[in-house]
C-alpha cells in the first residue's frame, strides 16, 4: 500500500495535520505523504469562516448568536474516545470539548472516569498521617509545658529554644503574608495595565532595600544573599522589558475572565485562608518540635510522652516536618490550580457559544480535582517536593562546607545545587500545564505531562509561554511578599530580643522559615492567575482557531504585540 492509499484508508477520526504542520514534518523527516484537502485537509473559503474536516473533524460555519465556537453538531462528545498518544504526533486536535454543553462534566466529558494514579493517593495518605501523628505528639508536649514556654512575648522561662514568643512572631508573619498576597491580587485587577511594571519596580526596590538594610545592621550573610537575588532580578528586568506589552495583553485577558467569573475570586480568597490556616498549624508544629525534642537539660518536654530528646532526633523531625508541610501546601495549591483550570477552560471553549458557560464549572472542576484527579495531583506535588527537599539539604551542606573552609566541597555542592535548581524549574514549568490538561481531560499525571510537552513543542508555544512573563511576574510578586514577611520576622526578633536568641543563632532558621511560609501562602493566592495562564496557553496550543473565531480582538492583539504568534498559531 503506497502513501496515498494509506492516507485514504485512515480512520475517520484520525488526526489530519494542517498544511503548516505538514510542511514542517516534510522538512524535518522527509515525510512525503500527499496532503489531500478533499480527504480531510484544511480548506479555507474566502467568503466565510469555514473549517471542515470531512472525516470527522469540526466545522464553524454556524457561529450562533454570540459568534463563538459552536463545534460540530454531528459529534457525539459523551461517547467520543481520545485517540492513543504516539510519539510522532500530539494528541488528536479533533477530540474537542463540547461548547454547547449545559454542565462542565458534559463539556469536558471523561468517557470512563476512574481514579488515576492511586499510588499518589496512598503516598498522600501516608505523609499526611505521619505529619498528623508527629503534630499531635509535639503539640501535646507544648500544652503540657505551656507555663514553662510562657503566655506572651516575655513571660516564659524557656531561654534556650523556640517558645511562645516564636508563635507570636509567626502570627505576624502569616498576617503579613495574607494581607500582602490579597492586596497584590487586588492590584492585578485594579491596575492591570500597570501591574507588571508595578511588580518589577516594587520587587527591585524592596529586594535592594532589604539587602542594604541587612548589611547596615550587620547581618552580612543574609545581605549578600539578597544582593545576589536583587542583581539577578535587575538583569532579568532589563532583558525582558520589551516583552511587557505582550504579557500585558495576556494578563488583561486573564483578569477579564476573573471579572466575568466571580468564582475565581472566591476560590482565591478561600485558598489564601486555607493556606494561612495550614501555615499556622505548620508553624505551631515546628515550634512544638523544639519544645519537645530540644536536648537541653532544662527542657521539661523531654519528660513528656513521645520519646527522649536528642539533637539528631530534633534535626531529623524538623526536616521531616518541613518536607511534609511543603508537600501538603503543594497539594493544596495544585487542587486550586486544577479547579480554576476548569473555569478558564470553560471560558475559552464555551463562553461565546449559544449555551454559554457551563453551570457550576468551578464546583464540578473541584469535585473532579479531589476525586479522580487527586492521585495525579499528589504524585506531581511529590516530585516537586522531593526536588526542593534535596535542594534544601544541599544548601545546608554547602553552608557547613563554607563555614569549615572546604572550598572544593563548597564549589561542588554549589554546582549540584544549581543542577537541581534547573531540574526543579523544568518540573514545575511542565507541571503547570500537566495540571491544566488533567483538569480538562481527566488523564493521569504522566500521560498529561507527555501530551502537554509534545503539544507545546509541536505548536511552538513553549517559546511563546516563556515570552509571556506572567509566571515570572507572579513569582516576583510572591517573592516580594516573602521578603516582606522575612523582614517582619527579622525585625520582630531583633527588637523584641528574646533570651533564646541572645547569641543570634536563631536568626537564620526563624527568618528562613518565615520566608518559606509566606512564599507558599502567596503562591496559593496567585495560583488562580498562574492556572489561568497555563490553561490559556494549553487551549491556545491545542485549538488556536477557537480564539481567532470566538475572541478575534484578543487574537489580533496577541499577534500585534507578539508577531511570531501568527506563524506559531497557523490554522
From Swiss-Prot:
Transmembrane segments: 119-139, 167-187, 190-210, 212-232, 264-284, 312-332, 370-390, 407-427, 473-493, 504-524
Entry GO CC: membrane; plasma membrane
This protein's UniProt keywords: Cell membrane, Membrane, Transmembrane, Transmembrane helix, Transport
Membrane topology designation: Multi-pass membrane protein
Predominant location category: membrane
Single GO biological process annotation from the record: transmembrane transport
Domain of life: Eukaryota
Bias kind Pro residues: ranges: 81-90
Bias (Low complexity) ranges: 39-52, 71-80
GO molecular function, one term: transmembrane transporter activity
PANTHER family: CHOLINE TRANSPORTER-LIKE (SLC FAMILY 44), PROTEIN PNS1
Protein name: Protein PNS1
Amino acid at each position: 500500500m503506497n502513501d496515498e492509499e494509506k492516507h485514504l484508508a485512515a480512520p475517520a477520526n484520525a488526526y489530519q495535520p494542517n498544511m503548516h504542520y505538514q510542511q514542517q514534518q516534510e522538512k524535518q523527516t522527509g515525510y512525503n505523504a500527499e496532503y489531500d484537502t478533499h480527504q480531510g485537509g484544511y480548506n479555507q473559503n474566502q467568503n466565510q469562516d469555514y473549517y471542515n474536516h470531512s472525516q470527522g473533524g469540526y466545522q464553524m460555519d454556524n457561529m450562533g448568536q454570540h459568534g463563538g465556537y459552536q463545534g460540530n453538531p454531528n459529534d457525539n462528545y459523551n461517547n467520543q474516545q481520545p485517540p492513543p498518544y504516539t510519539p510522532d504526533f500530539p494528541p488528536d486536535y479533533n477530540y474537542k470539548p463540547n461548547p454547547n454543553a449545559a454542565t462542565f462534566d458534559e463539556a469536558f466529558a471523561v468517557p470512563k472516569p476512574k481514579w488515576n494514579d492511586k499510588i499518589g493517593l496512598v503516598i498522600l495518605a501516608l505523609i499526611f498521617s505521619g505529619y498528623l501523628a508527629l503534630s499531635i505528639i509535639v503539640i501535646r508536649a507544648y500544652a503540657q509545658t505551656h507555663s514553662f514556654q510562657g503566655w506572651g512575648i516575655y513571660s516564659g522561662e524557656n531561654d534556650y529554644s523556640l517558645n511562645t514568643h516564636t508563635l507570636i512572631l509567626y502570627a505576624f508573619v502569616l498576617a503579613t503574608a495574607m494581607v500582602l498576597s490579597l492586596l497584590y491580587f487586588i492590584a492585578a485587577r485594579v491596575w492591570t495595565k500597570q501591574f507588571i511594571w508595578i511588580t518589577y519596580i516594587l520587587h527591585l526596590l524592596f529586594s535592594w532595600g532589604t539587602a542594604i538594610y541587612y548589611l547596615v545592621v550587620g547581618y552580612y550573610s543574609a545581605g549578600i544573599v539578597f544582593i545576589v537575588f536583587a542583581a539577578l532580578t535587575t538583569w532579568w528586568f532589563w532583558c525582558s522589558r520589551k516583552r511587557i506589552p505582550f504579557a500585558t495583553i495576556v494578563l488583561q485577558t486573564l483578569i477579564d475572565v476573573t471579572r466575568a467569573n466571580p468564582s475565581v475570586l472566591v476560590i482565591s480568597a478561600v485558598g489564601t485562608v486555607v493556606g494561612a490556616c495550614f501555615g499556622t498549624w505548620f508553624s505551631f508544629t515546628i515550634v512544638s518540635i523544639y519544645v519537645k525534642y530540644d536536648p537541653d537539660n532544662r527542657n521539661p518536654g523531654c519528660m513528656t510522652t513521645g520519646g527522649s530528646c536528642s539533637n539528631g532526633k530534633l534535626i531529623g523531625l524538623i526536616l521531616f516536618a518541613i518536607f511534609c508541610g511543603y508537600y501538603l501546601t503543594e497539594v493544596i495549591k495544585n487542587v486550586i490550580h486544577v479547579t480554576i483550570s476548569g473555569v478558564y477552560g470553560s471560558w475559552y471553549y464555551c463562553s461565546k457559544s449559544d449555551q454559554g458557560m457551563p453551570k457550576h464549572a468551578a464546583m464540578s472542576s473541584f469535585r473532579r480535582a479531589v476525586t479522580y484527579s487527586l492521585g495525579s495531583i499528589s504524585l506531581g506535588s511529590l516530585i516537586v517536593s522531593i526536588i526542593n527537599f534535596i535542594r534544601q539539604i544541599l544548601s545546608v551542606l554547602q553552608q557547613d562546607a563554607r563555614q569549615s573552609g572546604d572550598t572544593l566541597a563548597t564549589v561542588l555542592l554549589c554546582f549540584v545545587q544549581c543542577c537541581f535548581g534547573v531540574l526543579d524549574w523544568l518540573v514545575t514549568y511542565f507541571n503547570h500545564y500537566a495540571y491544566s490538561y488533567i483538569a480538562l481531560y481527566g488523564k493521569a499525571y504522566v500521560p498529561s505531562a507527555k501530551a502537554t510537552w509534545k503539544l507545546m513543542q509541536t505548536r511552538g508555544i513553549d517559546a511563546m509561554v516563556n515570552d509571556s512573563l506572567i509566571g515570572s511576574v507572579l513569582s516576583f510578586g510572591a517573592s516580594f511578599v516573602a521578603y516582606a514577611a522575612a523582614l517582619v520576622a527579622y525585625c520582630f526578633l531583633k527588637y523584641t530580643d528574646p533570651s533564646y536568641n541572645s547569641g543570634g543563632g536563631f536568626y537564620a532558621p526563624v527568618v528562613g522559615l518565615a520566608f518559606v511560609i509566606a512564599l507558599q501562602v502567596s503562591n496559593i493566592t496567585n495560583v488562580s492567575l498562574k492556572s489561568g495562564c497555563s490553561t490559556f496557553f494549553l487551549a491556545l496550543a491545542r485549538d488556536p482557531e477557537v480564539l481567532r473565531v470566538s475572541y478575534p480582538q484578543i487574537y489580533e492583539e496577541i499577534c500585534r504585540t507578539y508577531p511570531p504568534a501568527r506563524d506559531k498559531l497557523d490554522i
